[in-house]
Amino acid sequence: MINRDDPDFWANLVDVVAQGTWQTLYMVFVALLFTVVIGIATGVLLVTTEEGGLYAKPFGSRALGKATNRVLDVVVNIGRSIPFIILMFLLIPFTRFVVGSFIGPTAAIVPLTIAGIPFFARLVEIAVREVPRGIIDAAVSLGATKRTILFKVLLAEAIPALTLGLSTTVVGLIGYSAMVGAVGGGGLGDVAYRYGYQRYSLEYMLVVVVLLVLLVQILQSVGNYVARRTSHR
């Protein structure tokens, strides 16, 4: 149990929480980087490889397009259906293979990324589907290439929805990072567990909760602001 009368109590709290905050930001935003790159590609393929889609016949083969669409859909559904706490333990051998360890902030990036990709991919799919068909048809009638339609029509028009999806994903990853911390992943979750729970320090627990709430509010507000600024409506 932590002694609140210790003259170094608050100084130690600040140091521990600062380190935990840095670890949380590190694991969340590195995981987010991989999540965004792979998630956008996956979400776009889910839309463009379906019947009548932009890449419904990759390399001239509808069978390949259909197979790609079905495989990605199944993988995304499986990824979203596994509870994160189970996914963490399931990925321990893979995490150890990739990083060399299954504990610490760097190791936590692996399960965070794998959990984030299917979640964000589905949000990307929804955002791209919301692009009016008339805009796509107009681009096709003007002779735009598939690449132009993809980047300058589909993704460009979907930016507001993608931004909201991104902020939602970040919030989800922050929540996941707290769970990772409770099993040795570091970050604010680790601080709350080791100091707030195991050592019965209400001060540590409250500071962690306040920081997590502030972090979520700030990131969500930024996402909402960017979405409003980029909306054409």
Give, region by region, the residue ranges found by the protein language model:
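Non-cytoplasmic
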Residues: F89, F94, G165-L214, S221, ...
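C-terminal transmembrane helix and the adjacent membrane-cytosol boundary/short C-terminal tail
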Residues: L45-G52, S141, M205-R233
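Periplasmic/extracellular loop-to-transmembrane helix junction in inner-membrane transport proteins
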Residues: M1-L32, K57-R70
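Cytoplasmic-entry segments and transmembrane alpha-helices of multi-pass inner-membrane transporters
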Residues: L45-L90, L112, L123-I126
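Transmembrane alpha-helices
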Residues: F29, A144-S177
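Short helix-to-coil transition segments within interhelical loops
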Residues: V128-A158, G185-G186, Q198
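Transmembrane alpha-helix signature in integral membrane proteins
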Residues: V17-T48, G52, L166
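Loop-to-helix entry region at the N-terminal start of transmembrane alpha-helices
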Residues: Q19-V28, N77-R80, F84-F119, Y204, ...
